[in-house]
């Protein structure tokens, strides 16, 4: 893991956001490795208190980059030798979605980081919502298309888990019926 930008942890005098950004806290590869070297969990969490409360981010990271170490190499991710840059999108309030602007700043940070490291980039956007028109013209759709054309960037967006639940519907409303 080359870094974690946790937008849910407010910046302090000791904990800063990434350069050029105003919210959250950036934990560097050095911070993460120093925390992992500590056996005491509370001390480790003092250094890097970012956690995946739902397990979803960990699950998605395993699919992308799992090494198979816990399964004797049987279950590996798509790219087990890749570097991981975590952006925990922002809203410290339970059961709420991050703002579109937080996703956009996360993508911007990832692209800038990949460019600075001269590395290709795959961004996995795996959080669900049903915002917008879904016709390719919403601000987030336009932004992601533009970002995907910059540098060596692929952006993968989950299509949802709703199946046939009719989250979106179409029809004609008839007055007084």
What role is predicted for each listed range?
Residues 91-177:
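Substrate-binding/access-modulating region of protease and related hydrolase catalytic domains
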Residues 1-101, 118-119, 152, 167:
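Subtilisin-like serine protease catalytic core
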């Amino acid at each position: 893991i080359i870094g974690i930008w946790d937008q849910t942890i407010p910046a302090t005098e000791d904990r800063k956001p990434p350069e050029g950004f105003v919210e959250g806290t950036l934990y560097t590869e050095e911070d993460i490795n120093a925390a992992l070297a500590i056996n005491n969990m509370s001390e480790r969490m003092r250094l890097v208190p970012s956690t995946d409360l739902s397990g979803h981010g960990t699950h998605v990271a395993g699919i992308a980059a799992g090494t198979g170490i816990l399964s004797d190499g049987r279950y590996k991710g798509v790219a087990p030798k890749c570097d991981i840059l975590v952006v925990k999108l922002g809203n410290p309030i339970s059961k709420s979605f991050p703002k579109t602007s937080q996703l956009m700043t996360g993508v911007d940070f990832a692209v800038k980081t990949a460019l600075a490291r001269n590395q290709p980039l795959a961004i996995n956007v795996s959080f669900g919502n049903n915002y917008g028109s879904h016709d390719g013209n919403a601000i987030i759709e336009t932004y992601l298309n533009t970002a995907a054309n910059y540098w060596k960037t692929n952006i993968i967006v989950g299509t949802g888990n709703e199946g046939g639940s009719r989250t979106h519907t179409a029809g004609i409303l008839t007055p007084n019926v």
